[in-house]
Design a protein with these regions (language model features):
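Beta-alpha junction/loop-to-helix N-cap segments that form part of ligand/metal-binding clefts
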Residues: 33, 48-54, 64, 68-137, ...
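Periplasmic-binding protein-like
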Residues: 95, 99-108, 128-130, 171-176, ...
Length: 408
């Protein structure tokens, strides 16, 4: 009799615990909605590298996840930061404080990303960076609330810088965009070149609003450097490559290195102009069957092939939603812990992982742009030169200045 009573009590307790657990899970999503904000450049010089493509990639991830997580709807909001840090900060603050956005995505433009990731820490929300590239985001400016996902200036430098320096291209001149990412890209690439016995013979910086780079290219040409490195991105990089072609930089024997080249940049340039460019990328649409399958879906919506920012926006959003599901809540620190715990295996990365500094570690790829005669069709732009394993592509934790990294 006593045993029967105890059994009945245990069953009742289990039922109550189950009800309480279900209730807890049902209430685990703040405001009964998971809200994701894409804060990006919708109309400016980086809009082709972010903009509507980033929005589409995040929307695809939400749809593929089923539109709900833990039984609650996933909502998408979008804003154009216009490449102005004050506007971006105002939007991010309103999103976090008033509109209760849980995660802000993309964040192209390093100055903006550095500001918003610090705000995410302050507000205990999450920021996932795919557009911006400054390696400071996971170095001295790391936060426990942010992830730097697809690439950074260190990995780009490690790829393109080492590939050319090892091939005997030891003297470099930098044509650098005068903003946070350009500075980081020049610094990281210079360090790689010097470590391999090379030298930087000169550099010049130009405002990112500059579209005529003739005077800067004349300096590069006069330097007689073996490599003219373009440390910038977007329309300014496209214009620089076109101008370099007009000035005969490569015809004069100098190598032109694009330190951040998006596949959409190559499309804008055309193979006749872009051929021979050496670049480092995290994603290429034609890499394998998985990348081709996802890229085909993206192309059907955007009428252009995706680049690493688009692919990273999709992959990181899916990973974020999976982490919410695994954590049973959208509370930022619980979700961040799951994001660091769960491996990333999809079309973007194999055995990817997020370190304590917020860096997502995955393989990087060094490509060379094909000559027109080598291309088999539209968007067939790259030939693979080298695969850089993730543990070699990104800054080692032993060299990190991130205060979250435990050493010794």
């Amino acid at each position: 009799m006593k045993t029967a009573v105890c059994s009945a009590l245990l069953v009742a307790a289990s039922m109550i615990a189950g009800i309480d657990g279900a209730a807890a899970q049902a209430g685990a999503i703040s405001d009964d909605v998971v809200k994701i904000g894409v804060l990006t450049d919708m109309s400016g010089q980086f809009s082709d590298e972010s903009g509507e493509g980033s929005v589409t990639a995040v929307r695809m991830a939400i749809e593929d996840f089923g539109g709900k997580v833990l039984g609650k709807p996933i909502e998408l909001v979008v804003a154009d930061h216009q490449n102005k840090p004050d506007i971006a900060s105002g939007i991010a603050r309103k999103w976090y404080d008033v509109e209760h956005v849980d995660m802000i995505a993309n964040l192209i433009n390093s100055s903006i990303a550095l500001s918003v990731t610090q705000m995410a820490k302050e507000k205990n929300r999450i920021a996932i960076v795919n557009g911006a590239g400054s390696s400071r985001l996971t170095n001295e400016a790391c936060t426990p609330n942010s992830v730097h996902y697809s690439y950074d200036s260190y990995a780009l430098a490690r790829g393109t810088g080492s590939a050319l320096a090892k091939a005997g291209q030891k003297s470099w001149f930098f044509l650098t965009a005068d903003y946070a990412f350009g500075h980081a890209l020049e610094a990281d690439t210079s360090a790689v070149v010097k470590a391999l016995g090379g030298e930087v013979v000169g550099s010049t910086r130009y405002p990112i609003e500059t579209f005529d780079q003739s005077s800067f290219l004349l300096q590069a040409q006069a330097s007689k450097a073996q490599v003219v490195a373009l440390a910038g991105s977007g329309t300014v990089l496209v214009n620089a490559v076109k101008s370099a072609q007009d000035f005969g930089i490569r015809r004069g024997g100098q190598t032109l290195a694009g330190l951040l080249v998006w596949v959409t940049d190559v499309k804008s340039l055309g193979l006749e102009t872009a051929q021979g460019l050496v670049l480092t990328d995290a994603f290429y649409w034609d890499r394998d069957d998985q990348t081709r399958a996802w890229s085909k879906r993206f192309y059907e919506r955007m009428k252009k092939m995706p680049h690493m920012g688009d692919a990273g926006d999709y992959s990181s959003t899916m990973h974020y939603l999976k982490a919410i599901e695994a954590a049973g809540t959208d509370e930022a620190q619980a979700v961040m812990a799951k994001m660091r715990e769960l491996p990333i295996n999809d079309f973007f990365a194999t055995n990817g992982r997020i370190r304590e500094d917020g860096r997502m570690v995955h393989d990087m790829y060094v490509y060379e742009v094909k000559a027109p005669s080598e291309s088999k069709g539209d968007w067939d732009f790259y030939k693979l030169r080298e695969v850089i394993p993730g543990d070699q592509a990104f800054r080692p934790l032993r060299d990190s200045l991130c205060p979250l990294v435990k050493k010794g």
